[in-house]
Amino acid sequence: MKPEDRFFSELHKAKILVVGDVMLDRYWYGEVNRISPEAPVPIVKIDTGRSKETPGGAANVAMNAAALGANVALLSVVGDDEPGRRLAELLEKAGVSAYLHRDAEVSTTVKLRVIGAHQQMFRVDFETAPSHEVLLDKLADFGHMIADRNVIILSDYGKGGLTHIASMIEVARARGKTVLVDPKGDDYSRYRGATVVTPNRSELQTVVGRWKSEDELTAKAQALREKLGVAALLVTRSEDGMTLYEKDRRSHEPARAREVFDVSGAGDTVIATLGVMLGAGMPLRDAVSVANQAGGIVVGKLGTAVVQPEELRGALAAA
């Protein structure tokens, strides 16, 4: 029996709180047959019968955790609008307990992708930052909601929903909670004291600069980990897999993807799977290995998607 097998019957013990920037991912599908006479751009004739809506950002993290069988709550801010209501419907259908503060001053973030000729032609983003008052209300709710949760996932998409993330980490760690952070931007001091921070390769380069060798990367990653006072730094590296940096230790997981169709949302799947496995009692290094497998599965799907337990078990059995 592989070490991860016995934990699959324990996934319901993972009680996850996801906090962060949510959005609605919309996909319009069509055909491309000609170039516009108005500008050198393709014309996409939309098939009105082919469209898709999925929760994105922190909502996608919550969806992935729920799909694995965890007990999941989501805390975020949306606008008082149709996309916000649609998000709430989709989350409820997936079994996520969503606590969405409605801010009439903002629009729910929507990412509209137009797909033609089997590829994404372009993306249109609709977004505004939430108000200070709503964010303070969310911070107060956070203090109450973490009581019965064993893992907190903070999903930062840089949309303003995690303005008080430093306070959230401080409160959660004071209560002994495992805190995972999917970071954004170049100011990682806000994540000080978290348990694990999970930047991708590009995000890490923004903070520590480029590296020319594995030894240089290790030195930079360990220096950042120590500076932030986090237990571990998990760097996702696309085709190069992912690397975990702990105190006096580096461990690497090679990439598992057989085919890559779409990398959007892969980081959400990785941190969600990591959180669920830790919440079920799995040791960190084993949880990273499982999360790596989940990431390899989801990049083989088009658009933001989730990984089902049977898919994950199958991939682990074949590894």
Task: Identify the function of each model-found stretch.
Residues K13-I16, L24-V151, V306-A319:
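Conserved N-terminal subdomain of the carbohydrate kinase-like
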Residues R149-G161:
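Short acidic, glycine-rich surface-loop motifs adjacent to enzyme active sites
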Residues K159-R250:
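Conserved phosphate/ATP/ADP-binding segment of small-molecule kinases
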Residues L11, I146-A147, Y188-R192:
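A short, aliphatic-rich alpha-helical micro-motif
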Residues A65, L74, L91, L112, ...:
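Buried hydrophobic positions in well-ordered alpha/beta secondary-structure cores of metabolic enzymes
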Residues A231-A232, R256-L316:
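Conserved post-catalytic alpha-helical subdomain immediately downstream of the catalytic base
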Residues V22, Y157, T269:
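Active-site metal-binding loops of divalent metal-dependent hydrolases
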